[in-house]
Amino acid sequence: MLRADQDQYEPKDRKERAMSEKPKLELIYFNLRALAESPQMMMRYAGGEYRYEMAWDYYGKPWSETKLEVAFGQLPVLVVNDTVHIWQSGAIVRYLAKLTGTMPEDPLLEARVDAVFEQTQELCAPLNPTVNVKIGDDHLKFKAIFLNSFPGSLKNFARQLELSDEGPYFFGSKPYYCDFSAYHHFSLATILQQDILNAYPSVLNFMAAVENLSGVKEYLASRPEIIDVGTAPKLIIDGIAKPTGTKSS
């Protein structure tokens, strides 16, 4: 009998089953290291093909003109087979989890994985904007808010990791979609304070495990570097430093 932290399929089996049907996927977002990171890590992990496009390139006009035409005026949007548009980052991640073999088969385990995922989503604000767009005094203000609150959250995340006897992920030796979201947020936190994870060996072990996943390792090595955080944040794309944000540079 399976425990609630076990899955009847091995990671390779789940990935191969999930990716046997390959829809056309286009992920539309901005020049930010934020809500599109987990989806891209998951797709790279599964070896799936997708296109990542800036909003202004996909829609052919500035976001300020396109926003009213997009569902709820929000990005990211995942376009499936040129027709179906999925918005809300959580909905995108859960859909992709079924395609990438990172959604548990067991309903109870699925609920527990989703609980961890939702907990990571609570780190989005102020973390994502603080790293990506805030500058000057505004950056310092929101950085202080995050650094004051995050240690308590991190302690709880570490405790959840330590409940897994098999590790190194939240629910054993296999990564689920919650693990990719946790990695993204933890890695952003280290941009604000490099040693912020160091008090918890379980978290450091988790980070190393995600970074060495096939596909993810290559993605992390090739994705745009973020620089000048807090002063004039930019992503280096094809060797060119481009300001972060919702506008084409």
Language-model features: where?
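A generic membrane alpha-helix/interface feature
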Residues: 65, 197, 231-233
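Short, solvent-exposed turn/loop segments enriched in Gly/Ser/Thr/Pro and often Arg
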Residues: 30, 177, 223-226
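Acidic/histidine-enriched, glycine/proline-rich intrinsically disordered or flexible terminal extensions
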Residues: 223-249
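Acidic carboxylate-rich catalytic motifs and surrounding loops in phosphoryl-/glycosyl-chemistry enzymes
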Residues: 54, 221-224
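GST-like domain detector, emphasizing the conserved glutathione-binding G-site
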Residues: 3, 9-144, 148, 237, ...
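GST-like fold's C-terminal all-alpha helical module
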Residues: 108, 112-219
